[in-house]
A protein has these predicted regions:
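Acidic, surface-exposed loops and disordered segments
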Residues: 1-167
Length: 167
């Protein structure tokens, strides 16, 4: 993949992309908690921090998380040692009024998370191809939360193990 940048931007942004070849190598708790902590420092309206994470890094939770993925994503994401479901609280904690910025703020948190991961040599790939209704039921997510994405997190793997259409 060749990308041409017209301006001088942060190297982390230049280097970041969403590969599909994952190694099964475990991610250390220190690295995992650091990338989650980076997300916690994302800017948000009234510092609400509406994002919520459901972390799957053990086999039982990974199996559950994989079961919500559509087959196209499951083909490659099944090797990722961590899957992270991201949801956004739709109302403010203070007054239960609608937070019109919940998705914008949650996207900012995802961006911070992905850049911290990149800095640590960890790859991330956000997916839209999963069953939101199944996720809501399996993980008991209330209607006050909007399910945003599932993110594969891990180390870069062997691209030759992917089918040609996924390379």
């Amino acid at each position: 993949m060749t990308r041409i940048f017209k301006h001088d931007i942060l190297p982390l942004i230049k280097e970041r992309w969403s590969p599909r070849a994952y190694s099964e190598e475990k991610i250390s708790k220190d690295d995992l908690y650091a990338i989650l902590e980076a997300a916690s420092y994302a800017l948000s309206c009234f510092n609400e921090q509406p994002w919520r994470f459901i972390l799957a890094d053990d086999e039982k939770t990974l199996t559950k998380m994989r079961s919500i993925l559509y087959s196209g994503n499951l083909q490659w994401a099944q090797k990722a040692p961590v899957l992270l479901l991201i949801a956004a609280k739709k109302t403010f904690s203070l007054n239960n009024e609608e937070n019109f910025w919940h998705m914008f703020d949650t996207g900012t948190a995802w961006g911070f998370l992905s850049l911290e991961a990149q800095k640590r040599g960890i790859i991330t790939h956000a997916m839209g191809g999963f069953s939101m209704s199944k996720a809501r039921k399996l993980f008991k997510i209330s209607d006050d939360y909007e399910i945003v994405t599932v993110v594969a997190i891990g180390r870069y793997g062997d691209i030759s193990q992917l089918s040609d259409d996924l390379k």
